[in-house]
Amino acid sequence: MTHLHLLLIATILLSPFSISESQAMEKPLEGHVIVIAHRGASGERPEHTIAIYSRAIDQGADYIEPDLVLTKDGILVARHENEISETTDIADKAEFADRKTTKTIDGQKMTGWFTEDFTLAELKTLRAKERLPQLRSANMAYDGQFEIPTFDEILALAKAQSAATGRTIGVYPETKHPSYFASIGLPHEGPLLAALTKYGHVEKSAPVFIQSFEVENLKALRSKTKLRLIQLMDEKGSPADRKDLTYPQ
């Protein structure tokens, strides 16, 4: 539970509200606190794998949080970025060497291999590796062991673990670079809602929160679903799809 405790404590410490120690002792927190496993229990294994989402659930997480990008054939998979050289062993695959390329994603030039250039079957031949070896070097012992999971597989895990544990395990997906993916004919909204509907997640009461740093995909989702939507914000800058706005606006 160590990493989940740290995440919960950090969330409280970084909140915009400040109370004194005496006030905290006099008035305990009210309401229901949920524990969200950001990218799974990523302090212990390479992030965004079924193994590490399962680990987080075993540690008591209420929600597992996948970042979602799309494949060439329109399947949602969990990766921190659509450029996957930092999170998989793709650079070691000679058969994919010619697909290394440079793209501009949300105004930033990136060189590597991108999920949208591969089918799901091709991505399933890859194995995950630690994204931040300088910070989580122990996780490197697990490099090469785990597949890239699909969103469907993550939802199936949450359903199975809910039944096994007697707890409701929710999902807290983030759409990554949605305006970019929409621009290349791979919008998130259709496959995202189709997968959630398959598992019965259609009402506001469902254990689902859909989050994004962008604006327009949340607006599109608002007209198509009753599920809860979360607008993510940075301390500075603008949404990638709304440069006319700053996050405080």
Model-derived regions: residue spans:
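Bacterial N-terminal signal peptides
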Residues: L7-P16
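Compositionally biased regions
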Residues: H3, P16-Q23
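Phosphate-group recognition and catalysis centered on beta-loop-alpha active-site segments
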Residues: E21-Q249
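Bacterial N-terminal signal peptides that target proteins for export
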Residues: M1-L7
